[in-house]
């Protein structure tokens, strides 16, 4: 059984994240979307909120599980018995950062493989930060994020 970990902040989770998770779940037996608990990073949603939003948003993906961690990613990957880290790339601009991260992770844990998924074309142009900005200005993000996230963003920004 191959377990893969898809780590991220997921602040908030987007349809692009879910697309990567769904595609990864067709290849791996289990995909754990692991929310990185970053106490030093300014985030819109708390770790508990991000986990809850992810759980609601992945109910339709039976091979996708949700968890949280606050250690080195490779240490977390090993702790859950996984052998693969899943990452997504939207555009060429993501490649350098992902390449550097992969090199660091492979140096720390040569036994863990990194698998990069290219974003589906409809998800290449936006990120979680884009979603937050649009939502903060009162824009419609329902086509970018799952329903539970739309509702959460409306609560945060107090609109509509």
From Swiss-Prot:
<keyword id="KW-0173">Coenzyme A biosynthesis</keyword>
<feature type="binding site">
    <location>
        <begin position="9"/>
        <end position="10"/>
    </location>
    <ligand>
        <name>ATP</name>
    </ligand>
</feature>
<dbReference type="GO" id="GO:0004595">
    <property type="term" value="F:pantetheine-phosphate adenylyltransferase activity"/>
</dbReference>
<feature type="binding site">
    <location>
        <position position="73"/>
    </location>
    <ligand>
        <name>substrate</name>
    </ligand>
</feature>
<feature type="site" description="Transition state stabilizer">
    <location>
        <position position="17"/>
    </location>
</feature>
<dbReference type="InterPro" id="IPR014729">
    <property type="entry name" value="Rossmann-like_a/b/a_fold"/>
</dbReference>
<comment type="similarity">
    <text>Belongs to the bacterial CoaD family.</text>
</comment>
<feature type="binding site">
    <location>
        <position position="87"/>
    </location>
    <ligand>
        <name>substrate</name>
    </ligand>
</feature>
<comment type="function">
    <text>Reversibly transfers an adenylyl group from ATP to 4'-phosphopantetheine, yielding dephospho-CoA (dPCoA) and pyrophosphate.</text>
</comment>
<dbReference type="GO" id="GO:0015937">
    <property type="term" value="P:coenzyme A biosynthetic process"/>
</dbReference>
<keyword id="KW-0460">Magnesium</keyword>
<feature type="binding site">
    <location>
        <position position="98"/>
    </location>
    <ligand>
        <name>ATP</name>
    </ligand>
</feature>
<feature type="binding site">
    <location>
        <begin position="123"/>
        <end position="129"/>
    </location>
    <ligand>
        <name>ATP</name>
    </ligand>
</feature>
<keyword id="KW-0808">Transferase</keyword>
<dbReference type="GO" id="GO:0005524">
    <property type="term" value="F:ATP binding"/>
</dbReference>
<comment type="pathway">
    <text>Cofactor biosynthesis; coenzyme A biosynthesis; CoA from (R)-pantothenate: step 4/5.</text>
</comment>
<feature type="binding site">
    <location>
        <begin position="88"/>
        <end position="90"/>
    </location>
    <ligand>
        <name>ATP</name>
    </ligand>
</feature>
<keyword id="KW-0963">Cytoplasm</keyword>
<dbReference type="InterPro" id="IPR001980">
    <property type="entry name" value="PPAT"/>
</dbReference>
<protein>
    <recommendedName>
        <fullName>Phosphopantetheine adenylyltransferase</fullName>
        <ecNumber>2.7.7.3</ecNumber>
    </recommendedName>
</protein>
<keyword id="KW-0548">Nucleotidyltransferase</keyword>
<feature type="binding site">
    <location>
        <position position="41"/>
    </location>
    <ligand>
        <name>substrate</name>
    </ligand>
</feature>
<feature type="binding site">
    <location>
        <position position="9"/>
    </location>
    <ligand>
        <name>substrate</name>
    </ligand>
</feature>
<keyword id="KW-0067">ATP-binding</keyword>
<keyword id="KW-0547">Nucleotide-binding</keyword>
<feature type="binding site">
    <location>
        <position position="17"/>
    </location>
    <ligand>
        <name>ATP</name>
    </ligand>
</feature>
<dbReference type="Pfam" id="PF01467">
    <property type="entry name" value="CTP_transf_like"/>
</dbReference>
<dbReference type="GO" id="GO:0005737">
    <property type="term" value="C:cytoplasm"/>
</dbReference>
<dbReference type="InterPro" id="IPR004821">
    <property type="entry name" value="Cyt_trans-like"/>
</dbReference>
<comment type="subunit">
    <text>Homohexamer.</text>
</comment>
